[in-house]
Regions:
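Active-site-proximal helices and loops of the catalytic beta/alpha 8
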Residues: 2-80, 110-113, 128-164, 168-169
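Conserved interdomain hinge at the start of the Helicase C-terminal
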Residues: 102-106
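Active-site flanking residues adjacent to catalytic metal/cofactor-binding acidic residues
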Residues: 26, 85, 125
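Short acidic/histidine-rich active-site segments
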Residues: 120-127
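Hydrophobic/aromatic residues located in beta-strands of well-ordered beta-sheets
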Residues: 24, 119-120
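Carbohydrate-binding surface patches
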Residues: 175-180
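Active-site clefts of carbohydrate-active enzymes
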Residues: 74-99, 131-133
C-alpha cells in the first residue's frame, strides 16, 4: 500500500468519530490493514489463484493453502472482497469468461461460499455479459434481460442470505476441511 497505515488509522479514527458504523474497504491485501483501520480488503491472491487454477497453471489445493494462511494472519472479523472480475481486471485482463473459461461458475460460487467472503458482483456479471470494458472511455452496459446467469446469481445470494454459516466474518461459520 502506498499510503502509510498510520495515515489510515488516524483517518479511520476521525471518520468513525463522525459516523461510527462507517465501513472501510482497502483496495489492497496486506494483513496489517486491519489494524485499527479497514474492515475489509481485496482478496487479490485468491483472485489470481482462481485464475491460475482455471487455466491449469496450478493445482486447486493452492486455494486451500491460501485459506489456511489467510486465517492465521487476519482477525476473525475481517472480510475479504472476493471476486472473479472488477474494473481493473475486466479492462486489462479480459472478462471472467476469457480468464476462467468453463470454471467461471465454480469460481463465482467460491466467492460467495468461502469464509470471510464479501462477494463482489461486477458490472454485467449478473447477466453473463461477456465484455471487456474500456477503461478510459465511455463503454455503457447494454440493456440486459434476466437469464440463466441471473438465476444462478439469485440462487447464490439467496443461499448466502438463508444460511447463517455463510455470513461474513465472525457471524458466519468456521472453515472446516473434511478430508476423504
Amino acid at each position: 500500500m502506498l499510503v502509510p497505515i498510520e495515515f489510515w488509522q488516524e483517518a479511520a479514527r476521525w471518520l468513525r468519530a463522525v459516523k461510527p458504523d462507517l465501513f472501510l474497504l482497502a483496495e489492497a491485501e496486506e494483513d496489517y490493514l486491519f489494524d485499527r483501520a479497514f474492515d475489509a480488503s481485496y482478496a487479490w491472491r485468491l483472485y489470481h489463484l482462481m485464475n491460475d487454477v482455471a487455466q491449469q497453471k496450478c493445482r486447486v489445493d493452492r486455494i486451500r493453502e491460501y485459506l489456511y494462511a489467510d486465517r492465521k494472519h487476519v482477525p476473525a472479523w475481517a472480510l475479504r472482497l472476493m471476486f472473479t472480475s472488477n474494473h481493473d481486471e475486466n479492462s486489462w485482463s479480459g472478462s471472467e469468461f476469457v480468464r476462467l473459461g468453463p470454471a467461471v461458475r465454480v469460481m463465482t460460487a467460491l466467492t460467495f461460499l468461502l469464509p470471510q467472503s464479501l462477494p463482489l458482483v461486477y458490472t454485467g456479471q449478473e447477466f453473463g455479459y461477456d465484455h471487456s470494458f474500456a477503461f478510459f472511455d465511455r463503454d455503457p452496459l447494454p440493456a440486459c434481460e434476466p437469464n440463466e446467469t441471473t438465476e444462478f446469481y439469485r440462487r447464490l445470494i439467496a443461499l448466502r442470505h438463508d444460511a447463517p454459516a455463510l455470513a461474513s466474518g465472525e457471524r458466519g461459520g468456521s472453515f472446516v476441511e473434511i478430508r476423504n
